[in-house]
């Protein structure tokens, strides 16, 4: 049996029936990592995870299983989620050497229930990017074709699951940062409803949109981990309860479900391979008795602009804390305070991060605040969110391709950053309206590159979305393990 090709639920079944030790399974994943380090999915593999695995094996031997429903479950973690006594750098030189003094709420809930954290994964610096090339630690490669990007910003978390270096991983999703790399690497990527998982301990990029998400080969694993990590948290006032009676996920017919396709997201705008796959996806769903209607949402044309106005504004505020006085790496020259701030941030932040900070400050300036930022917030709250709420009164889910484009070639020089930002046009919808969304691996092109399909559900109906996705995977025969 290949011990590095298992779901979390299968791992637990094997260890609870004493057919395998947690240590041996973890060692198989670590060996895969050692053999394929060039993918650069991990920033650090935790050596102490092997000792924790041994300790849990002893617990199993002595039948000490009380309150450990996730025992034996191995999880990699994106480098912007706090783990006590572990390095946290957000893949930035400016945080080099910083050790987190506390656990994020999601991490604490996983640890308390027996999960083992096995490493921290690469990412675009401060979660700003769509390729996972903007990292202090170098680019993460796509395991399906190493000449192409894996997508970002949670590219490392996607890569370690796709390359069977971890059975499950945590990422963060602000505008598609879980779903895009999941689509590009041929695995499942799930973003919960806004507030469904506590953001306490997640390094902030754009607080209105940030959400911890999951990568896996198994929809059941996603539902299980969501069950044990979701819910309100006194440390995060935006957190909410989302658990409902759709768990455990049930096998049900797709017959009679109502799906919406947004007219303005035209197939004419998509890469040819993506357009063909999306057309086939719709035909496959229709053949299962699903109703699909095309709806017009003219405000969709504002979606990307609104996201790239609000997110850099919030980023410019959130990243103001990285001055060199409290966190991470410091320069040692004797400078005035303002010169110290300027030199520190100029030296240790990447060009992409500086670009978004400058844009955010520009949009907040007295001259432009009401023209851009205030207007974007007004359109989002008064037009876009109500329009989608109205749409969900007559449909169960919205379907789109996860991305209009295929993976980019590594090292592609984006002289116009908007070309890269355009890859987020389908995924930002769920973040702006606070809805859950998932990317399903659907097809591959002639170069072996994966094309994913996105399903968006109703806000706070995460398990309903996962249940429907399970049945889509089952009835369409989509690949998984």
Curated annotation (Swiss-Prot):
Disulfide bonds: none
Catalytic activity, as annotated: L-glutamyl-tRNA(Gln) + L-glutamine + ATP + H2O = L-glutaminyl-tRNA(Gln) + L-glutamate + ADP + phosphate + H(+)
GO BP: translation
UniProt cross-references to SUPFAM superfamilies, sorted A to Z: Amidase signature (AS) enzymes
One of the record's GO molecular function terms: ATP binding
Domain of life: Bacteria
Coiled-coil intervals: none
GO CC annotations, alphabetized: glutamyl-tRNA(Gln) amidotransferase complex
Oligomer status and interactors: Heterotrimer of A, B and C subunits.
Task of the protein: Allows the formation of correctly charged Gln-tRNA(Gln) through the transamidation of misacylated Glu-tRNA(Gln) in organisms which lack glutaminyl-tRNA synthetase. The reaction takes place in the presence of glutamine and ATP through an activated gamma-phospho-Glu-tRNA(Gln).
HAMAP family, sorted: GatA
Annotated protein name in UniProt: Glutamyl-tRNA(Gln) amidotransferase subunit A
Organism per entry: Borreliella burgdorferi (strain ATCC 35210 / DSM 4680 / CIP 102532 / B31)
Organism classification: Bacteria, Pseudomonadati, Spirochaetota, Spirochaetia, Spirochaetales
Gene: gatA
């Amino acid at each position: 049996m290949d011990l590095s090709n298992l779901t979390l639920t299968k791992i637990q079944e094997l260890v609870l029936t004493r057919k395998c030790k947690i240590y041996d399974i973890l060692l198989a994943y670590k060996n895969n990592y050692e053999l394929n380090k060039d993918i650069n999915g991990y920033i650090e593999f935790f050596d102490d995870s092997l000792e924790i695995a041994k300790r849990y094996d002893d617990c199993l031997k002595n039948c000490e299983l009380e309150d450990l429903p996730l025992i034996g479950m191995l999880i990699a973690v994106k480098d912007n989620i706090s783990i006590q006594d572990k390095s946290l750098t957000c893949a930035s030189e400016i945080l080099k050497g910083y050790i987190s003094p506390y656990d994020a709420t999601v991490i604490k809930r996983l640890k308390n229930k027996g999960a083992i954290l096995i490493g921290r994964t690469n990412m675009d610096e401060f979660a700003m990017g769509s390729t996972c090339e903007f990292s202090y630690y170098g680019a993460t490669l796509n395991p399906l074709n190493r000449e192409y990007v894996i997508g970002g910003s949670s590219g490392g978390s996607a890569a370690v699951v796709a390359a069977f270096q971890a059975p499950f991983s945590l990422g963060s999703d602000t505008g598609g940062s879980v779903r895009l790399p999941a689509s590009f690497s041929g695995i499942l990527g799930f973003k919960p409803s806004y507030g469904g998982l506590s953001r306490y301990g997640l390094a902030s990029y754009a607080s209105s949109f940030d959400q911890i998400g999951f990568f896996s080969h198994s929809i059941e694993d996603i539902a299980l981990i969501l069950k044990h990590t979701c819910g309100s948290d006194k440390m995060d006032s935006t957190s909410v309860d989302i658990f409902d009676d759709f768990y455990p996920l049930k096998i049900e017919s797709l017959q009679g479900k109502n799906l919406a396709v947004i007219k303005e997201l035209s197939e004419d705008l998509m890469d040819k391979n993506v357009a063909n796959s999306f057309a086939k996806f719709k035909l496959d769903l229709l053949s299962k008795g699903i109703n699909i209607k095309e709806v017009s949402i003219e405000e969709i044309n504002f979606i990307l602009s609104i996201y790239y106005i609000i997110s850099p504004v919030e980023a410019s505020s959130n990243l103001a804390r990285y001055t060199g006085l409290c966190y991470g790496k410091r320069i040692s020259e004797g400078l005035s305070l303002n010169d110290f701030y300027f030199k520190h941030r100029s030296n240790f932040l990447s060009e992409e991060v500086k670009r978004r900070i400058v844009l955010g400050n520009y949009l907040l300036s007295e001259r432009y605040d009401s023209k851009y930022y205030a207007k974007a917030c007004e359109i989002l709250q008064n037009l876009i969110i109500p329009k989608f709420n109205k749409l969900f009164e007559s449909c169960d889910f919205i379907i789109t391709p996860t991305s209009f484009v295929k993976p980019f070639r590594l090292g592609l020089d984006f002289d116009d950053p908007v070309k890269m930002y355009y890859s987020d046009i389908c995924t930002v919808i769920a973040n702006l309206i606070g809805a859950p969304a998932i990317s399903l691996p659907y097809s591959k092109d002639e170069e072996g590159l994966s094309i994913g399909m996105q399903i968006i559900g109703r806000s706070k109906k995460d398990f309903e979305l996962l249940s429907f996705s399970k049945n889509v995977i089952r009835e369409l025969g989509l690949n998984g393990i």
